[in-house]
Amino acid sequence: MNKKSTAIFLMGPTASGKTDLAIQLHQELPVEVISVDSALIYKGMDIGTAKPNAQELALTPHRLIDIKDPSENYSAAEFRHDALQEMQKITQQGKIPLLVGGTMLYYKALLEGLSPLPSADEKVRLEIEQKAEKFGWATLHNELAKIDPISAQRINPNDSQRINRALEVFYLTGQSLTELTAQKGKEIPYHIIQFAIAPDRAVLHQRIEQRFHKMIEQGFQQEVEKLYQRSDLHPNLPSIRCVGYRQMWEYLQGNYDKDEMIFRGICATRQLAKRQLTWLRGWKSPIEWLDSLNPKSTKEKIIKTIKHNCK
């Protein structure tokens, strides 16, 4: 049996210092960086996403950054496909893939594979919507309860979008959403070493606030104004729903003043960090936690672990 190639996950909440650490590791280890961030994929969204700057990217190139226009969607399945391709290219060069970011759903998809859910079918969705107009979503929720009682219990009777998707999956496959999501895709064909970096809550909150104010100083408002002027962008797109961007967009719409926008942006970023930490604390695979307040010992710990595992 061939020995699996090694890959490294460097996970953590927003503003935890992942990018700086990745750049240091790139200077001392034979690693190439792959971004695992659902916001960094977008072109023209640099300041509000805390994207590495041109100098940092010249020093340490990041793959899967700036690969989509803000008008486009990008799924966890697409990420898995693209990341595995990049990982293969890196290992073929005799180097180690270093996956850095905080989009935990992407890590999960990469690690465990994805359930074999069908793609959306506009014709089927339209038929379900027409049925709902005639009989009401409560009736369709009752139908779902007969087909898939577990999903029906989870989904609010007023949540038309999720009822539609659950019924659509059944109509297309003959299997319930619960049955299909229980099926795992292919696991990642690599030996994964996983690290997580997370400062103390008070430190993280302070960093998030400082970083948001710094983004404002760097021209975050002007960045979002350019997006706001585009006729093809709107608040329901994943790009505009990114933390900070949504609040700035609503400020530009006149929904609240600048101080309120800053307050909401900081709060939303802190909530994102909390969700990311919740994911990490419930992570099934073994994680080595790093001391974010001692960068030197953190870097040395990673280097020692990698060298030991790559003998």
From Swiss-Prot:
Reactions the enzyme catalyzes: adenosine(37) in tRNA + dimethylallyl diphosphate = N(6)-dimethylallyladenosine(37) in tRNA + diphosphate
Keywords associated with the record: ATP-binding, Magnesium, Nucleotide-binding, Transferase, tRNA processing
Residues under site feature: Interaction with substrate tRNA: 103, 125
GO molecular function, one term: tRNA dimethylallyltransferase activity
Keyword Acyltransferase found: no
Chain intervals for the UniProt region annotation (Interaction with substrate tRNA): 37-40, 161-165, 241-246
Domain of life: Bacteria
Regions that span the bilayer: none
EC number, UniProt record: 2.5.1.75
Binding site for substrate: 14-19
Top-level EC class: transferase
Residues reported in the UniProt entry to bind ATP: 12-19
Cofactors, names only: Mg(2+)
GO term, biological process aspect, one: tRNA modification
Function: Catalyzes the transfer of a dimethylallyl group onto the adenine at position 37 in tRNAs that read codons beginning with uridine, leading to the formation of N6-(dimethylallyl)adenosine (i(6)A).
Assembly information from the UniProt record: Monomer.
Family: Belongs to the IPP transferase family.
Protein name: tRNA dimethylallyltransferase
Species this protein is from: Histophilus somni (strain 129Pt) (Haemophilus somnus)
Lineage of the organism: Bacteria, Pseudomonadati, Pseudomonadota, Gammaproteobacteria, Pasteurellales
